[in-house]
Amino acid sequence: EVKRTSHTAWSITSVSFGTAMTAPGSVASSRQEYDSSKTETSYSYVVTAVKTSTGDESVASSSTSISNNNLSSTVTNTITWNAASGADSYNVYKSRGGIFGFIGRATGTTFKDDNIESDSNDSPAIARTLFNTTNEYPATVNYYQQRLVFGQTNNDPQKIYMSQTGNYHNFNISEPLRDSDAVTFTIAASQVNEIRHLVPLSDLIILTSGGEWLMTANDGVISPSSVQVKPQGYRGSADAPPIVIGNTIIHLQAKGGIIRDLAFALESDSYTGNDLTVLANHLFAGKTVKEWAYAQA
């Protein structure tokens, strides 16, 4: 990751993808007011560590299980764990039908379950391993709606990878998916054209070697279940990065000899544009633009 923190301060650092939080260790459970003459039920729990300021959550700890009578205000299970570095709070999940669901949050290292109903729609994060082998490294990157967005690997030239909201290096997901989870999808098209550029405007514009695509959401907010991708045209874009002037994209057509603009047009309700090289065609005939820059007045 290349960072510039001042006019002359640049740094290059290695990036580790996934949560920055470590799962709590030594998770254990104990029972209170147990009666051996009554029916027993098995209970299983996992715990995650949370950094409140970022919402970053670790993957689940190892599970702990215990048998007890049916839980109540007096018959309870207590779950304990060791503190995790950097954690502000801890989420506790209980298994029901083989699925761990959220039952509560603790700021300390102990939690009491007195028959709390688990929410199976809120489950612990699942770790994913991305970008760690040859042909799996992304070729283009940008930011959109507080997510880090990657596009195009050699193995998946039309695939988009979006981080969790606000956690730029975390591409973990949950099951079922949360709205803030990482988003991964492939542009479905009749041709395979590599993604070359990602341009954030009010929508995310995806420029490929063969076309222009609009990524948006049903309600305007990107989530794993709301992503929509719509074609805007099929002219394609060259390797040289596009330039954004105001709310208009200036980009090179696929072979690099034609300059086009791309902006939202109310009359067509889509992003469209014109060939700008016709204004001075003699300057570009037989030539390919390799690099360019724009200085705003």
Language-model segments: which ranges?
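Disordered, low-complexity "stalk" and linker segments at domain junctions of extracellular
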Residues: 1-144
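Trp- and S/T/G-rich repeat-edge/linker motifs of beta-rich repeat architectures
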Residues: 2-25, 62-63, 105, 115-135, ...
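N-terminal assembly/attachment segments of tailed bacteriophage virion structural proteins
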Residues: 44-88, 174-188, 197, 217, ...
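Flexible, glycine-rich phosphate/dinucleotide-binding loops
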Residues: 56, 99-101, 157, 221, ...
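Structured loops at beta-to-helix junctions and adjacent beta-edge loops in soluble globular domains
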Residues: 95, 116, 151-153, 254
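Beta-sheet-dominated scaffold domains
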Residues: 140-141, 147, 154-155, 186-297
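Beta-rich globular "head" domains
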Residues: 146-152, 160-161
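Short Gly/aromatic-enriched secondary-structure transition segments
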Residues: 155-168
